[in-house]
Amino acid sequence: MGKKMVVALGGNAILSNDASAHAQQQALVQTSAYLVHLIKQGHRLIVSHGNGPQVGNLLLQQQAADSEKNPAMPLDTCVAMTQGSIGYWLSNALNQELNKAGIKKQVATVLTQVVVDPADEAFKNPTKPIGPFLTEAEAKEAMQAGAIFKEDAGRGWRKVVPSPKPIDIHEAETINTLIKNDIITISCGGGGIPVVGQELKGVEAVIDKDFASEKLAELVDADALVILTGVDYVCINYGKPDEKQLTNVTVAELEEYKQAGHFAPGSMLPKIEAAIQFVESQPNKQAIITSLENLGSMSGDEIVGTVVTK
């Protein structure tokens, strides 16, 4: 019997060197062909995705057109806008590939609000860079309005926002209902729209999409969390002569490698932490970190990728 899987798409599944809408749609057609391999094997999919380049470009457009009569939209609204655009492209691409395969299934995109704690320490120390690069003078002028800017690796100054951890997903029950009715679901785009309180007030923040995907996998009681990235395996001693691929690894082993500093913050580390958190959430859970091209191996005797178990 197939598994209920949350599949978190990496940036390379959407964006190539061409940032046009057409190119991103074409990339998602190729991505959808890989996802359909899983659907053919009987798996039930909840697909999440990033939005970093897309929301960055949208913020540039908002800034360029900002005026009294046409004010720029806030970050939470921009995240919602990219959830809509990428969700539209992805659902369209999935429908194309399902039709080619002769599979009759519905696809639904869910605008997803992810609840964060207003007392999260991340709000005291914004670290996530967003938007365009500015000169120091431009950044200092912008900071007078209350924004926080930091110098970014010699490339200029960028606005930084908090990256709080998700504590709940408002639409989780809706997503689970769709899955129970065998509807392929796209949700938690860009880590979700960050909201706080019972009134679900949007806040200026960015939620890591791997942590949001993990929280979603917990809430819908998924069997597996599949995190896609640009490499086939998680490695220790990455880029060194003694580099080693991890195939089957336990949470305890991953924790040791993490403490030894094998995983880079902002790159592989959040994927590792999300995988550990999901596998520890309940018995018999599995996390897989691999590349898009290896999705077809998920039901084989040997999964190509790093399989994390308790």
Swiss-Prot record:
Molecular-function annotations in GO: ATP binding; carbamate kinase activity
UniProt GO BP: arginine deiminase pathway
Outcome, altering D210A: Almost no activity
Entry annotated with the keyword Nucleotide-binding: yes
Cellular compartment(s): Cytoplasm
Reactions mediated catalytically: hydrogencarbonate + NH4(+) + ATP = carbamoyl phosphate + ADP + H2O + H(+)
Factors inducing expression: By arginine.
Protein's organism: Enterococcus faecium
GO cellular component, one term: cytosol
Primary role: Catalyzes the reversible synthesis of carbamate and ATP from carbamoyl phosphate and ADP. Can also catalyze, although with low efficiency, the phosphorylation of bicarbonate, leading to the formation of carboxyphosphate, an unstable intermediate found in the reactions catalyzed by carbamoyl-phosphate synthase and biotin carboxylase. Can also use acetate.
EC number: 2.7.2.2
Annotated protein name in UniProt: Carbamate kinase 1
Listed result of changing K140A: No change in activity
Regulation of its activity: Inhibited by adenosine(5')pentaphospho(5')adenosine (Ap5A), Ap6A and to a much lower extent by Ap4A.
Keyword Transferase: yes
